[in-house]
Amino acid sequence: MQLDEPIPHPNQIDKPWLTALLKKNGVLASNGIRHIQVDASPSTNAHIARIQIEYDAGAQRDAPRSLILKTVEAGAGFVRNSEVNYYARDYLDLADAPIPKCYAAHVDSDNGSYSILMEDLSSTHDKDTSPGFQYGLEVASALARLHVFGWGEERIQKLDGRISDNAKLDRYIAHVRQGLDWLLEATRTDIPDLWREAILDIFEHHPRKMWERTNDPTGFTIVHGDINPGNILYPVNGGKVYFLDRQPFTWSLTTWLGVSDLSYLMVQYWDTEQRRQLELSVLEQYHRQLIDNGVTDYGWDQLLADYKLCIPQVVYTVAEWCIQPEDRDRMRWLWRLELERAMHAFFDWGCAP
C-alpha cells in the first residue's frame, strides 16, 4: 500500500502511474494496463472518481477491475487522519475486515486534505438496502467484529484513542446544544407538547448519564460513528458486509459505547415498525458475536441498558442539523423524520429520566 506519496488528481491518473501502484501492491505482475476510464461520481462530503481498468491478456485474477478515488478537501471539519487510518492502518491486522481494500492513501501534512484509493465493490454490493431480518443479523455480526478489534481501554489506546472524559463529552454536548433553541422554534407548531418536554428533559438530564457511564470502561470501543444505510455495502448474491466512510467531525465522539453504532442505525434510519420488529434480534446477534470474538465481561442486561442510554443521542443529531440555517431548512425532510423516529424509540424504551 502506498502511503508516503501524493495521489494524482483524477484527470492526471495515467496507465504508468496506476501500473506501478498495482505492482507495488502485488496484484499486477508483468502484464500491464491496456486502458483506463475515469468518471466522476456524486458525493456529499468528498470528490469521488471511479477508475475502470482493462488489462493486457494474462493479468492476475485478483487485479482490480475498478477502483474508487475519494478526495476530501481541507477545512471539511473532520478529525484529521481518521478516515485514512480507518482504511490504511487501524484494521490491517483484523483478518477479513469488513472494510474495502485500500491501495493508496495520503494526507497533506500542511492542510489535512486527503485522498484514498480503494477497491470498488459496486458490482457486487448495494448501498441503502432495505432492512430485513438477515440484513440486520449480518450487519450486527460485521459490526461486532470491527468493534472487538478496538474493544476495551488497552485496544482503544493502541488505536490512538481514549475513553471520552467529561471534557470531551462537554464539547460534544456544547456543540449540539447550539441547535436546541432552533429545533424547538422550527417545530413549534408541528410536534406535541410531550415531545417538546422530552427534548428539554434529554438536554437537561441525559448528559449526566453519559458522564456517569464513563466511570465503567466495559462496552467502550472505537466506534464508526456514522453507520447509516449509505455507508453499508451489502452483498447482492452472497458475501460479506463492508462499512464505508469513518469520517467523524471534530466535535464527534470517536470512542464510545459500541452499541451506539446500532442505535444510530436502527433508531435514526429504520422505519419505526421495522425497528420494533428487528432490533432485539439484531442486538442479540451483536451480543453473541461479541462473545464469539472474545468479549467476556459484557452482559446482555448491560448491553440493553447501554442501547437505551444511546437512543437519546439521535435527538442530539437532530439538534445538530438545526445549528446552521441552510441545514435547518434544506435538510428538514430528513431531521424531522429522524426526530419522529427518535421520539418513538425514546418512549418505547422508557428513556425518560
Q: What residue spans do the PLM features occupy?
A:
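Conserved NTP-binding catalytic cores of kinases and kinase-like/nucleotidyltransferase enzymes
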Residues: 1-113, 235-241, 353
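Regulatory N- and C-terminal appendages and interdomain linkers associated
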Residues: 1-43, 56-64, 154, 210-217, ...
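Active-site acidic catalytic loop and adjacent metal/ATP-binding pocket
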Residues: 40-58, 204-258
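Glycine- and acidic
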Residues: 72, 125-129, 244-247, 264-272
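Active-site activation/catalytic loop segments of kinase-like enzymes and analogous catalytic loops
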Residues: 85, 251, 255-294, 311-331
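AlphaC helix (C-helix) of the protein kinase catalytic domain N-lobe
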Residues: 87, 143-146, 265
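Conserved structural core of kinase catalytic domains
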Residues: 104-138
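ATP-dependent phospho-/nucleotidyl transfer catalytic cores
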Residues: 125-224, 235-237, 334-337, 345-352
